[in-house]
């Protein structure tokens, strides 16, 4: 009788320990996944801010730079493409992020061409509204870089958790999948050639 009671208590303690570990590990993975989704939301938020600044920037430039209609149209169409691509936070795969990043990169390149063309219009560069929009755009680009970095850090922490043993067993059972990362743009590892 005493031996049976001891065995039952030992089994109950072991079962409780396993249950506690499963619960703790599962909840940790859920928290990690929610942190990744939150970080992704912030990335989308700052990209949306940039997209929202573009119509005002285009309208300001249009008033001064009538000969830049091709550049303005490329910015408008790049903005349209960039805002059409959405990524489901539950499916943050490397391919989905690469597609999103590509569309946003096109928009960034078009904006860069627009800002370069402005150099030919000194009265536009002196316009207070344009200077304010340019400053806001610069600040937004900095925020984008920061939020992308935070997203990558959060995704890396989550991916490490779900790939580590023995949590990877539970991740597989409960369907937790790795999240993709933002990657450096092609050619970013090569320094630009500067000649004087």
Stretch-by-stretch model annotation:
Residues 1-196:
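A helix-centric hydrophobic-segment signal that preferentially recognizes long
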């Amino acid at each position: 009788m005493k031996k049976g009671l001891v065995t039952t208590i030992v089994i109950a303690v072991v079962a409780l320990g396993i249950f506690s570990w499963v619960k703790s590990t599962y909840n940790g993975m859920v928290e990690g996944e929610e942190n990744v989704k939150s970080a992704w939301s912030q990335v989308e938020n700052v990209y949306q801010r940039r997209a929202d600044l573009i119509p005002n920037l285009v309208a300001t430039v249009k008033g001064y730079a009538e000969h830049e209609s091709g550049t303005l149209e490329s910015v408008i169409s790049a903005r349209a493409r960039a805002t059409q691509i959405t990524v489901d936070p539950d499916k943050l795969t490397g391919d989905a992020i690469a597609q999103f990043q590509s569309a946003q990169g096109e928009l960034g390149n078009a904006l860069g061409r627009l800002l370069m063309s402005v150099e030919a219009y000194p009265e536009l560069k002196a316009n207070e509204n344009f200077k304010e929009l340019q400053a806001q755009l610069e600040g937004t680009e900095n925020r984008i870089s920061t939020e992308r970095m935070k997203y990558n850090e959060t995704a890396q922490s989550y991916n490490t958790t779900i790939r580590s043993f023995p949590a990877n067993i539970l991740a597989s059972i409960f369907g937790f999948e790795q999240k993709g990362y933002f990657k450096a743009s092609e050619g970013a590892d090569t320094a630009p050639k500067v000649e004087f």
